[in-house]
Amino acid sequence: MPELENKFQVIVSKRAAQQLVEHAVFMARLEERLARQLAADFRKAADSLQSFPYRNPILRSSVFVTEKYRKMVFGKWYLLIYQIKGERVFVEYVIDGRQDYQ
């Protein structure tokens, strides 16, 4: 009997897409391969949210005061910030974890 698995719809906000582009442009100045790898890592992370998006911890922060957001690390130090509403996962932010976003 095949295993039944919930599939969540993942929606990337314009803001998150723009933040990803900004990070990739910066990395491309250093080495184009790094920018391509960042984009691939983001796709893999976002795609993985289709299954088990609750596996990542709730984001506790003075900036994000409500506990509606979750965080997922991808690449070496980037954070994918998202929230779950019903069967949809909304990717809201892409943050460089080395920077103080607090």
Which role does the model predict for each range below?
Residues 1-41:
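Arg/Lys-rich, positively charged N-terminal/basic patches that mediate binding to nucleic acids
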Residues 54-86:
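Basic/aromatic recognition patch in beta-strand/loop cores that engages polyanionic ligands
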Residues 3, 74-102:
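Enriched for short, Lys/Arg-rich terminal
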Residues 32, 47, 51-54, 77, ...:
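Generic structural signal for secondary-structure transition and capping sites
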Residues 24, 53, 95:
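Short, flexible helix/strand-to-coil boundary loops that buttress conserved ligand/catalytic motifs
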Residues 24, 43-50:
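Structural signal for well-ordered, non-membrane alpha-helices
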